[in-house]
Amino acid sequence: VETGNREQGTGNSIAVYFLVRNEHAEGFKVYYNSIKDYTDAEDKKKYFSSHKFRDLGFTHFKPDKNGNWINQADNDFDSLLPLVDKDVKAGKGEEAVFKLFSSGVKTQRDEWVYDFSQNALEEKVKFLVGIYQKTLKDANHSGKHQIKWDRELTKYLDKRINKNFQTQQIIKSLYRPYNQQYLYFDKHFNGMTYQWFNIYNNSDLDNKYIALNVGAIKFGVIASDKIIDLGSLLVGGGSTQCLPLYRYDKEGKRIDNITDWGLKQIQSHYQDKTITKIDIFNYTYAVLHNPEYRKKYELNLKRDFPRLPFYENFHQWVNWGKQLMELHINYERVAPYNLTRVDIPLKDYQKTPKPKLKADKTKGNIILDDVTTLQSIPSEAWEYMLGNRCALEWILDQYKEKKPKDPTIAEKFNTYRFADYKEQVIDLLKRVCTVSVETMKIINLMSSSQP
């Protein structure tokens, strides 16, 4: 049973085992009974106290061919086209649609290397580099514990690697859905960069990435033309995995990341040699938004990387994927939705409004602070979900004022104030409201197109 917060998608799996010993038995049998996820502690106690052991209703079960004991899926998932394969990634095979895939960047020190403000980020990173260099010269430097160390950074220190601040390493990234932040992109100060130095080129404005959460309790997908953080779609376990349109060799030359094998499979199935690799990229993005696909393969998507089915009317799905891609990547340039802004005066004893950043879905409102509320948010805007939150809720969560966990950041660099970004957030919410409504129109067309 899952315990935790259903709304936030956080939970822990709890199991109670009854082990029955029988010296005369050959082999073993496993019997299983489940309680509804997110049942609270009191209800679980009542469940056990109100049932006799023999009345709990255990079911005898066996693992399927993939080793899954529970939540077994009875569908054609294994027969679909594999999007990725570890052997293909390692150059030992070719049977996957994408050559490379990568986890999002895992910096190990987000508060040090991410920020809404480029100037604030520069200050933090210069301090970080300074302490690192002082520790490099003197292992007993008294201030060494002022920065966040991890295994990787300690390893680079042991290798005597010198560092200096480089302004050009500050780039825009997709930190969370519809939330861009500046990132100091650096091999040594970003704990795990995975494949990003092979799939990102700051001078190539044409590359795009499909990000999805693999192994999470709620599936989500988004596209970006920026570096993507590991936690972008991280809800209830799993990890954010990214599929690039292009990859790069050591000289920086662009290479198609969709394989010739993948192109051949799809062209052959549809008997259409005009299908391109960009078509396949857009088709993939559309399929991953299809509610029927998510419903049919719900159990598979909780533990496996998605696979690609062959839908009728291939080019219609390509077009839907292209429209979604343009909406989700260019969200800052879409027309803002016509929301109603209501401002009330501050109370006499208040100097500044207190940030709230709360959504009231029932009333169709977003309460930004003591002064400002956005009204008339259409109901379909709440339906565009990315994991366990809708797009608007992701924005509200990221712009809340939170005390930094790192003590040095809290003491020296805690400069974020919602008031400084309020008008920017209002504009962003209006535009992402448009994105949400238009996205749901396309998703509803997908649903109506299938029997």
Where in the sequence are the language-model features?
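Sequence-level detector for compositionally biased, low-complexity segments
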Residues: 1-451
